[in-house]
Amino acid sequence: MNAQESLRPLVHLPGVPEAVETARKAIDEVHEHPANRRGWATTAAEASVRAARASAAVAGGAVEIPEEGTVTDPLLAGSLRVAEALGPLLPTWQRAPLQALARLHVLAAADLVGADEQERLGRPRADEEVSSRLELLARTVTELGGQAQAAIPGPVQAAVVHGELLALAPFGEVDGIIARAAARLTVIASGLDPKGLVVPEVAHFRRQDEYASTARRFSSGSTEGVAAWITYCCRSLEAGAREARSIADSVRS
């Protein structure tokens, strides 16, 4: 069974088609904002920083970036490194997702381990189930970069990648930061938000209890749990589009 066949049933789960369409519309509209048509590099850069700050905060890190000096909080520093690397990593994500995930772990966790542990960064936990499910996820991502992409909406693709990485916690640390970054890569790669303007991470930060509980429901594998997670992710994308509009409005004013 290929990626398209395995994910197609998810597209038709209760509430998913409507949530996908609403998210798509919100993202399309923010891409038409005058600031995003002419100066999208500026708004995308601000979106990337806001995403990194929110993702670090969800993981328990600092939110604010010091006006002077360097970032000392290891989670925020790692999240900012991840954000800076997403653009260059996009081709690797589409071609060799496991390599991209390894790189994300190196960047996110670099300040959390001592010099004698640096070599283990980028290596998933030695667990047979983790290895097999990561391989399956990688095959799914690479297949979705081909013909299956048009058949499986970007919000569904991103929700599956995001939820599976949260459930697996493949590295044992900073897995949430990695999962959110991988979801962001998927949203961009799928063509849903090719400029990286949307900031769903802010919604995850503001709704942390719902985020965590719905992710657990996804990991259960139940039909209701998977549908709840996908629709939650769609609502977060919609909220992320509102955040993107606020960025664009501030740039234009």
Where are these regions (language model features)?
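FIC/Doc superfamily catalytic core
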Residues: M1-S253
